[in-house]
Amino acid sequence: MVFKKTQPSPSLKNPERIQSFKKLSKKIGIKFSKIEYYNTAFIHSSYKNENPEILEDNERLEFLGDSVLGLVAARSLFQKYPKASEGELSRIKSKIVSTPILNSIAEKLNLGEYLLLGKGEKNSQGKGRRKIAANLFESLVGAIYLDRGFEVAEKFIVQHLLEFAENPDMEESVRDYKTQLQEYSQKHFKTLPVYRMKGESGPDHSKMFQVSVRIRDQWEASGYGASKKIAEQNAAKELYIRIRRGF
Protein backbone atom coordinates (compact mmCIF):
# COMPACT_ATOMS: atom_id res chain seq x y z
CA MET A 1 0.00 0.00 0.00
CA VAL A 2 1.17 3.52 -0.83
CA PHE A 3 0.81 5.93 2.09
CA LYS A 4 0.44 9.62 1.42
CA LYS A 5 3.74 11.44 1.95
CA THR A 6 2.40 14.97 2.43
CA GLN A 7 -0.37 14.69 5.00
CA PRO A 8 -2.87 17.34 6.09
CA SER A 9 -3.47 18.46 9.62
CA PRO A 10 -5.65 16.03 11.61
CA SER A 11 -7.92 18.93 12.55
CA LEU A 12 -11.42 18.70 11.09
CA LYS A 13 -11.24 22.46 10.61
CA ASN A 14 -8.71 21.79 7.88
CA PRO A 15 -10.46 22.00 4.46
CA GLU A 16 -8.10 19.45 2.91
CA ARG A 17 -8.84 16.89 5.62
CA ILE A 18 -12.60 17.42 5.31
CA GLN A 19 -12.42 17.15 1.53
CA SER A 20 -10.52 13.87 1.80
CA PHE A 21 -13.35 12.33 3.82
CA LYS A 22 -15.94 13.55 1.33
CA LYS A 23 -13.93 11.75 -1.32
CA LEU A 24 -13.81 8.57 0.78
CA SER A 25 -17.54 8.78 1.53
CA LYS A 26 -18.32 8.93 -2.17
CA LYS A 27 -15.89 6.13 -2.98
CA ILE A 28 -17.41 3.61 -0.56
CA GLY A 29 -21.01 4.77 -1.05
CA ILE A 30 -21.71 5.63 2.59
CA LYS A 31 -22.83 9.04 3.80
CA PHE A 32 -20.79 10.08 6.84
CA SER A 33 -22.83 11.63 9.65
CA LYS A 34 -20.05 12.06 12.21
CA ILE A 35 -16.78 12.71 10.40
CA GLU A 36 -14.86 12.67 13.69
CA TYR A 37 -15.17 8.87 13.78
CA TYR A 38 -13.49 8.56 10.40
CA ASN A 39 -10.87 11.12 11.30
CA THR A 40 -9.88 8.96 14.28
CA ALA A 41 -10.05 5.79 12.16
CA PHE A 42 -7.25 7.15 10.00
CA ILE A 43 -4.85 8.27 12.75
CA HIS A 44 -2.17 5.64 13.37
CA SER A 45 -0.72 5.26 16.86
CA SER A 46 2.73 6.25 15.54
CA TYR A 47 1.33 9.61 14.40
CA LYS A 48 -0.29 10.18 17.79
CA ASN A 49 2.98 9.39 19.55
CA GLU A 50 4.81 11.99 17.47
CA ASN A 51 2.09 14.62 17.89
CA PRO A 52 1.19 15.19 21.57
CA GLU A 53 -1.84 17.32 20.65
CA ILE A 54 -3.54 14.22 19.22
CA LEU A 55 -5.71 12.66 21.92
CA GLU A 56 -6.79 9.41 20.26
CA ASP A 57 -5.58 7.00 17.58
CA ASN A 58 -7.45 4.29 15.68
CA GLU A 59 -6.62 1.29 17.88
CA ARG A 60 -9.95 1.25 19.75
CA LEU A 61 -11.85 1.50 16.47
CA GLU A 62 -9.67 -1.28 15.10
CA PHE A 63 -10.68 -3.47 18.05
CA LEU A 64 -14.35 -2.71 17.48
CA GLY A 65 -14.10 -3.23 13.73
CA ASP A 66 -12.40 -6.59 14.20
CA SER A 67 -15.32 -7.77 16.33
CA VAL A 68 -17.91 -6.54 13.83
CA LEU A 69 -16.00 -8.21 10.99
CA GLY A 70 -15.93 -11.49 12.87
CA LEU A 71 -19.65 -11.42 13.57
CA VAL A 72 -20.63 -10.53 10.01
CA ALA A 73 -18.31 -13.14 8.53
CA ALA A 74 -19.53 -15.86 10.90
CA ARG A 75 -23.22 -15.12 10.32
CA SER A 76 -22.83 -14.86 6.54
CA LEU A 77 -20.91 -18.13 6.30
CA PHE A 78 -23.38 -19.89 8.62
CA GLN A 79 -26.24 -18.89 6.32
CA LYS A 80 -24.42 -19.47 3.03
CA TYR A 81 -22.99 -22.93 3.80
CA PRO A 82 -25.71 -24.83 5.72
CA LYS A 83 -23.93 -28.19 5.32
CA ALA A 84 -20.47 -27.04 6.38
CA SER A 85 -19.11 -28.24 9.73
CA GLU A 86 -17.90 -25.95 12.50
CA GLY A 87 -14.32 -26.68 11.53
CA GLU A 88 -14.93 -25.91 7.87
CA LEU A 89 -16.71 -22.66 8.71
CA SER A 90 -13.86 -21.64 11.00
CA ARG A 91 -11.27 -22.27 8.30
CA ILE A 92 -13.18 -20.26 5.70
CA LYS A 93 -13.72 -17.45 8.20
CA SER A 94 -10.06 -17.32 9.20
CA LYS A 95 -9.12 -17.03 5.54
CA ILE A 96 -11.46 -14.19 4.61
CA VAL A 97 -10.59 -12.06 7.65
CA SER A 98 -6.85 -12.70 7.32
CA THR A 99 -4.28 -9.95 6.94
CA PRO A 100 -3.59 -10.66 3.23
CA ILE A 101 -7.29 -10.34 2.34
CA LEU A 102 -7.87 -7.20 4.41
CA ASN A 103 -4.68 -5.68 3.03
CA SER A 104 -5.83 -6.38 -0.53
CA ILE A 105 -9.15 -4.66 0.08
CA ALA A 106 -7.47 -1.70 1.77
CA GLU A 107 -5.25 -1.35 -1.29
CA LYS A 108 -8.22 -1.68 -3.62
CA LEU A 109 -9.93 1.20 -1.78
CA ASN A 110 -6.63 3.10 -1.51
CA LEU A 111 -7.20 3.68 2.21
CA GLY A 112 -3.57 4.63 2.74
CA GLU A 113 -4.30 7.95 1.05
CA TYR A 114 -6.29 9.05 4.11
CA LEU A 115 -4.01 7.67 6.84
CA LEU A 116 -1.94 9.89 9.13
CA LEU A 117 1.19 7.87 9.84
CA GLY A 118 4.28 8.58 11.94
CA LYS A 119 7.57 9.27 10.19
CA GLY A 120 9.12 6.04 11.39
CA GLU A 121 6.25 3.85 10.21
CA LYS A 122 6.26 5.38 6.72
CA ASN A 123 9.37 3.37 5.96
CA SER A 124 7.87 0.05 7.04
CA GLN A 125 7.85 -2.68 4.41
CA GLY A 126 6.49 -6.16 3.80
CA LYS A 127 4.42 -7.69 6.58
CA GLY A 128 4.51 -4.53 8.67
CA ARG A 129 2.94 -2.45 5.94
CA ARG A 130 0.36 -5.10 5.10
CA LYS A 131 -0.63 -5.31 8.77
CA ILE A 132 -1.08 -1.54 8.97
CA ALA A 133 -3.36 -1.65 5.92
CA ALA A 134 -5.38 -4.58 7.29
CA ASN A 135 -5.83 -2.81 10.63
CA LEU A 136 -6.90 0.31 8.77
CA PHE A 137 -9.75 -1.57 7.12
CA GLU A 138 -10.86 -2.81 10.56
CA SER A 139 -10.81 0.69 12.04
CA LEU A 140 -12.89 1.95 9.11
CA VAL A 141 -15.45 -0.78 9.79
CA GLY A 142 -15.52 0.31 13.44
CA ALA A 143 -16.15 3.92 12.42
CA ILE A 144 -18.95 2.92 10.04
CA TYR A 145 -20.56 0.82 12.78
CA LEU A 146 -20.53 3.69 15.30
CA ASP A 147 -21.68 6.25 12.75
CA ARG A 148 -24.29 4.36 10.72
CA GLY A 149 -25.09 1.22 12.68
CA PHE A 150 -24.74 -2.52 12.18
CA GLU A 151 -26.78 -2.90 8.98
CA VAL A 152 -24.72 -0.37 7.03
CA ALA A 153 -21.48 -1.85 8.37
CA GLU A 154 -22.64 -5.34 7.45
CA LYS A 155 -23.50 -4.28 3.90
CA PHE A 156 -20.08 -2.67 3.52
CA ILE A 157 -18.32 -5.80 4.78
CA VAL A 158 -20.27 -8.17 2.55
CA GLN A 159 -19.65 -5.97 -0.48
CA HIS A 160 -15.94 -5.43 0.03
CA LEU A 161 -14.83 -8.48 1.99
CA LEU A 162 -16.91 -11.60 1.48
CA GLU A 163 -17.46 -11.17 -2.25
CA PHE A 164 -13.79 -10.34 -2.77
CA ALA A 165 -12.72 -13.43 -0.83
CA GLU A 166 -14.83 -15.67 -3.05
CA ASN A 167 -13.38 -14.28 -6.28
CA PRO A 168 -12.16 -17.23 -8.39
CA ASP A 169 -9.02 -15.21 -9.20
CA MET A 170 -7.88 -15.95 -5.66
CA GLU A 171 -7.42 -19.63 -6.53
CA GLU A 172 -3.77 -19.00 -7.36
CA SER A 173 -3.12 -17.85 -3.81
CA VAL A 174 -4.49 -21.05 -2.27
CA ARG A 175 -1.70 -23.20 -0.85
CA ASP A 176 -1.26 -26.33 -2.97
CA TYR A 177 -2.41 -28.96 -0.50
CA LYS A 178 -3.42 -31.30 -3.35
CA THR A 179 0.22 -31.73 -4.29
CA GLN A 180 1.28 -32.17 -0.67
CA LEU A 181 -1.43 -34.77 -0.07
CA GLN A 182 -0.58 -36.63 -3.28
CA GLU A 183 3.12 -36.81 -2.42
CA TYR A 184 2.40 -37.91 1.14
CA SER A 185 -0.12 -40.53 -0.02
CA GLN A 186 2.28 -42.01 -2.59
CA LYS A 187 5.09 -42.17 -0.07
CA HIS A 188 3.19 -43.62 2.89
CA PHE A 189 0.19 -45.41 1.35
CA LYS A 190 1.51 -46.27 -2.13
CA THR A 191 -1.64 -44.94 -3.76
CA LEU A 192 -3.18 -41.69 -5.02
CA PRO A 193 -6.00 -39.72 -3.34
CA VAL A 194 -9.39 -40.04 -5.04
CA TYR A 195 -11.55 -36.91 -5.38
CA ARG A 196 -15.30 -37.03 -5.79
CA MET A 197 -17.84 -34.28 -6.44
CA LYS A 198 -20.45 -34.43 -3.67
CA GLY A 199 -22.75 -31.58 -4.67
CA GLU A 200 -23.25 -27.91 -5.31
CA SER A 201 -25.59 -25.24 -3.98
CA GLY A 202 -26.43 -21.58 -4.41
CA PRO A 203 -27.43 -19.44 -7.40
CA ASP A 204 -25.47 -19.57 -10.66
CA HIS A 205 -23.55 -16.38 -9.89
CA SER A 206 -22.50 -17.60 -6.44
CA LYS A 207 -22.11 -21.39 -6.53
CA MET A 208 -20.71 -23.38 -3.64
CA PHE A 209 -19.16 -26.77 -4.42
CA GLN A 210 -18.55 -29.72 -2.09
CA VAL A 211 -15.81 -32.23 -2.86
CA SER A 212 -14.65 -35.28 -0.91
CA VAL A 213 -11.22 -36.87 -1.02
CA ARG A 214 -10.38 -40.41 0.07
CA ILE A 215 -7.24 -42.47 0.51
CA ARG A 216 -8.18 -46.14 0.40
CA ASP A 217 -10.98 -46.73 2.91
CA GLN A 218 -8.93 -45.41 5.79
CA TRP A 219 -8.97 -41.64 5.38
CA GLU A 220 -11.66 -39.29 4.04
CA ALA A 221 -12.50 -35.58 4.27
CA SER A 222 -14.67 -32.98 2.56
CA GLY A 223 -14.08 -29.42 1.45
CA TYR A 224 -16.14 -26.48 0.20
CA GLY A 225 -15.28 -23.69 -2.21
CA ALA A 226 -16.54 -21.17 -4.74
CA SER A 227 -15.08 -23.39 -7.49
CA LYS A 228 -14.33 -27.10 -7.82
CA LYS A 229 -10.62 -26.33 -7.69
CA ILE A 230 -10.89 -24.47 -4.39
CA ALA A 231 -13.16 -27.18 -2.94
CA GLU A 232 -10.60 -29.83 -3.88
CA GLN A 233 -7.82 -27.80 -2.28
CA ASN A 234 -9.84 -27.37 0.92
CA ALA A 235 -10.66 -31.09 1.02
CA ALA A 236 -7.01 -31.95 0.48
CA LYS A 237 -5.98 -29.54 3.23
CA GLU A 238 -8.48 -31.05 5.68
CA LEU A 239 -7.34 -34.61 4.98
CA TYR A 240 -3.64 -33.75 4.95
CA ILE A 241 -3.89 -32.06 8.35
CA ARG A 242 -5.89 -34.97 9.80
CA ILE A 243 -3.36 -37.53 8.60
CA ARG A 244 -0.40 -35.58 9.92
CA ARG A 245 -2.12 -35.23 13.29
CA GLY A 246 -2.99 -38.91 13.34
CA PHE A 247 -6.79 -38.69 13.40
From Swiss-Prot:
One of this protein's Pfam families, by short name? Ribonucleas_3_3
Residues given in the record as Mg(2+) binding sites: E62, N135, E138
Which molecular function terms from Gene Ontology are attached?
Answer: double-stranded RNA binding; metal ion binding; ribonuclease III activity; rRNA binding
Q: Return the GO cellular component terms, semicolon-separated.
A: cytoplasm
The entry's keywords: Cytoplasm, Endonuclease, Hydrolase, Magnesium, Metal-binding, mRNA processing, Nuclease, RNA-binding, rRNA processing, rRNA-binding, tRNA processing
Domain RNase III, which positions? Answer: 21-149
On whether tRNA processing is a keyword of this UniProt record, the answer is: yes
Q: What is its EC number?
A: 3.1.26.3
> Where does this protein reside within or beyond the cell?
Cytoplasm
The protein's predominant localisation is: cytoplasm
Q: Which residues form the DRBM domain?
A: 176-245
Question: How does it associate, per the subunit comment?
Answer: Homodimer.
Instruction: Kindly give the NCBIfam families that the UniProt entry links to this protein.
Output: RNaseIII
The protein's name is Ribonuclease 3
Q: What is the protein's species of origin?
A: Leptospira borgpetersenii serovar Hardjo-bovis (strain L550)
Gene encoding the protein: rnc
